[in-house]
C-alpha cells in the first residue's frame, strides 16, 4: 500500500488544489492532505477553518484523509508512513523553491520520493494568494474555488475590521 502526503497551507483550498488531490488520489492507495499550521505565514484562515474547508471540499474522496500538522514535514511524513510527497508546480517560478525543498526532503528522508504534478490547464494561474486578494477587493472568485469556499471567503471578508485591516477577533 503506497501512502502519499500532499502538504500545504491551503489558504484557501482552491479548485487547483482539488484538481491535484483528485488526480493524485487515483495514483496512490491513500493520499493524506496535510494542512500546515504555517503561523509564520500569517494565514487568512485559522488552522481549524482551513481543516473544515478541506473536509468540506475533499470529504467525498474515499482514499483521502485530511489532517493538520505542525513542525517539520519529515515528521508528518514518517507519522503517516508515507513513501511519497506530492507537490504542485504551476510555473517555472514554483520550480526553484520546490526543487530545493525536494532536495532537502531527500536528505532528511532518503527513502521518500517527491512527485511533482502540474495543474490541469484551467488551473495553472490560480493561487490562494491571488484568490484571497480578489475576494478582499470584492471580486468574483467563483471560478477559482468551490461554492462552500466562496462562502467562507465572503464571511471572512465581511468580518474584517475596515479600520485596521485585521480579522475580527484577531490582532
Curated annotation (Swiss-Prot):
Q: Which GO terms describe its biological process?
A: coenzyme A biosynthetic process
Q: According to its UniProt record, which reaction does this protein catalyse?
A: (R)-4'-phosphopantetheine + ATP + H(+) = 3'-dephospho-CoA + diphosphate
Protein name (Swiss-Prot/TrEMBL): Phosphopantetheine adenylyltransferase
Which amino acids does the record list as binding substrate?
9, 41, 73, 87
Supply the source organism for this entry.
Paraburkholderia phytofirmans (strain DSM 17436 / LMG 22146 / PsJN) (Burkholderia phytofirmans)
Q: Which cofactor does it need?
A: Mg(2+)
- Site (Transition state stabilizer) found at 17
Q: What Enzyme Commission number(s) appear in the record?
A: 2.7.7.3
Q: Name one GO molecular function term.
A: pantetheine-phosphate adenylyltransferase activity
Q: Which residues bind ATP?
A: 9-10, 17, 88-90, 98, 123-129
Task: Report the GO terms under cellular component.
Answer: cytoplasm
Family of the protein in this entry:
Belongs to the bacterial CoaD family.
Q: Where in the cell is it found?
A: Cytoplasm
Amino acid at each position: 500500500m503506497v501512502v502519499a502526503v500532499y502538504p500545504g497551507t491551503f489558504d484557501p483550498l482552491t479548485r487547483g488544489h482539488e484538481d491535484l488531490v483528485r488526480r493524485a488520489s487515483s495514483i496512490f492507495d491513500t493520499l493524506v492532505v496535510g494542512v500546515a499550521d504555517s503561523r509564520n505565514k500569517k494565514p487568512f484562515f485559522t488552522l481549524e477553518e482551513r481543516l473544515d474547508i478541506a473536509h468540506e471540499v475533499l470529504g467525498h474522496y474515499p482514499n483521502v484523509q485530511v489532517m493538520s500538522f505542525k513542525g517539520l514535514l519529515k515528521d508528518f511524513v514518517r507519522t503517516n508512513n508515507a513513501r511519497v510527497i506530492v507537490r504542485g508546480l504551476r510555473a517555472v517560478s514554483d520550480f526553484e523553491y520546490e526543487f530545493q525543498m525536494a532536495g532537502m526532503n531527500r536528505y532528511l528522508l532518503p527513502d521518500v520520493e517527491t512527485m511533482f504534478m502540474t495543474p490541469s490547464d484551467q488551473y495553472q494561474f490560480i493561487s490562494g494568494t491571488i484568490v484571497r486578494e480578489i475576494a478582499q477587493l470584492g471580486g468574483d472568485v467563483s471560478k477559482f474555488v468551490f461554492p462552500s469556499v466562496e462562502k467562507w471567503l465572503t464571511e471572512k471578508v465581511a468580518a474584517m475590521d475596515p479600520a485596521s485591516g485585521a480579522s475580527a477577533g484577531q490582532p
